[in-house]
């Protein structure tokens, strides 16, 4: 985006102001035709004759001709720019006043059709030339014109003093003709040159500012401040969103680790369940417990003690004796306490009972569990029993 300094912005505002003023003060375009002359047909000879007559009665150049020449350098001269304002004092005294007034009236009627058109073309050409040169060049031309106007102010004052005397000697018809044929541009020029202090030209641009070329003028930048404030607000909001996104990413980065830890926990719990399934807590009186729910159900049954003397008759022998075991529990048959002497080593019966309980507790197919039980019954050594146990655990 292009940036401008304060001086350049001021120049742009001033040039736009001068252009707006020129557009507002511009006069309307005359009636235009396409491919045809603006002069009506049949009036060309009359206009040329009027121009020749005007040239024949034109007085010699006065002392204010340098000012006119300087003005004609800026604007292209047309037949109607040559004012007939000085013509009434310079008319010959040989002609009667009525004849001079009649000729001037005929000239005005003949040239009236093209006066407005030519004056409008002159104004448009002056404005187009000023627009091409730029306001700075018009100011320089105005400065060049000021000395010439100051030099021509003294002679013009002399002419202005002589004009009332000549007009006083002229006829009343000449006065009316003079008022009708006076040219506005020449009258404005005489007003500028009259007086001790010359009239200051209006400046379309401040002289202290740097001139700006019309060819390189860019668009005004009034909306830059609003755009900058909007961009700053948007950048702040974007930074806040970025910070929140960073926090969210930091929090979500731990999700894969949590998932992996949860998977590991599930795996470890499954392994522990398998180990608990293989490791059976066997109650001496309840060897058929095969699940944790059954074990809990057995644990809910509590022994009940009956206070007071019991009935010892079942445990008293005929001789009035009672046999107690190692736990001081009464035994009905004393032969139960007498165990035969066995060779030291593992008991095959206990091993068989343990493996049989393991086979029945495992969730296996009934045919495979029946085969293992048949092999267990036929086993006669500890090694065979252990092989059957491995098959039950693995299968």
From Swiss-Prot:
Annotated region described as Multimerization, given as residue ranges: 222-285
Transmembrane domains' residue ranges: none
Keywords: Phosphoprotein, Viral RNA replication
CDD domains per the UniProt record, alphabetical: MEV_P-protein-C_like (cd21031)
Subunit field text: Homotetramer. Interacts (via multimerization domain) with polymerase L; this interaction forms the polymerase L-P complex. Interacts (via N-terminus) with N0 (via Ncore); this interaction allows P to chaperon N0 to avoid N polymerization before encapsidation. Interacts (via C-terminus) with N-RNA template; this interaction positions the polymerase on the template for both transcription and replication.
Phylogenetic placement of the source organism: Viruses, Riboviria, Orthornavirae, Negarnaviricota, Haploviricotina
Stretches for region Disordered: 31-109, 126-214
Function noted in UniProt: Essential cofactor of the RNA polymerase L that plays a central role in the transcription and replication by forming the polymerase complex with RNA polymerase L and recruiting L to the genomic N-RNA template for RNA synthesis. Also plays a central role in the encapsidation of nascent RNA chains by forming the encapsidation complex with the nucleocapsid protein N (N-P complex). Acts as a chaperone for newly synthesized free N protein, so-called N0, allowing encapsidation of nascent RNA chains during replication.
Pfam families the record matches: Paramyx_P_V_C, Soyouz_module
Signal sequence interval, chain numbering: none
Biased composition regions of type Polar residues, renumbered to the chain: 75-98, 146-168, 203-212
The record's note on its domains: The N-terminus consists of a long intrinsically disordered tail. The central part contains the coiled-coil multimerization domain (PMD). Forms a four-stranded coiled coil structure. The C-terminus constitutes the alpha-helical domain that binds to the nucleocapsid (N-RNA complex).
Protein name: Phosphoprotein
Biased composition (Basic and acidic residues): 65-74
Ranges in coiled-coil conformation: none
Family recorded in the similarity comment: Belongs to the rubulavirus/avulavirus P protein family.
